[in-house]
Curated annotation (Swiss-Prot):
It comes from Halothermothrix orenii (strain H 168 / OCM 544 / DSM 9562). It is found in: Cytoplasm. This is Translational regulator CsrA. GO terms for cellular component: cytosol. GO terms for molecular function: mRNA 5'-UTR binding. Keywords: Bacterial flagellum biogenesis, Cytoplasm, Repressor, RNA-binding, Translation regulation.
Length: 81
């Protein structure tokens, strides 16, 4: 992990296209401003973790539904056969 020290109004540039600037310092809180291309997704870490958790749960639910649907199709075919 790269660790940098920045003061208010100072910035870092990532990959020549993402700018992270220290906008405000208030006690132990720092406000960052981020400028990035539209195709770059930016999330707070805790928000991303929640999104990934919800996506994982949705995928599990989809698998259960697909198994149920497949079972019903097999039953239908067996009855017709």
């Amino acid at each position: 992990m790269l660790i940098l020290t920045r003061k208010k109004d100072e910035a870092i540039i990532i990959d020549d296209k993402i700018k992270v600037k220290v906008v405000e310092i208030d006690g132990n809180k720092i406000k960052l401003g981020i400028e990035a291309p539209d195709d770059v997704t930016i999330h707070r870490e805790e928000v991303l973790k929640e999104i990934l958790k919800e996506n994982k749960q949705a995928l599990k639910q989809k698998r259960v539904l697909n198994r149920d649907y497949t079972s019903r199709i097999k039953e239908f075919i067996a009855k017709k056969g």
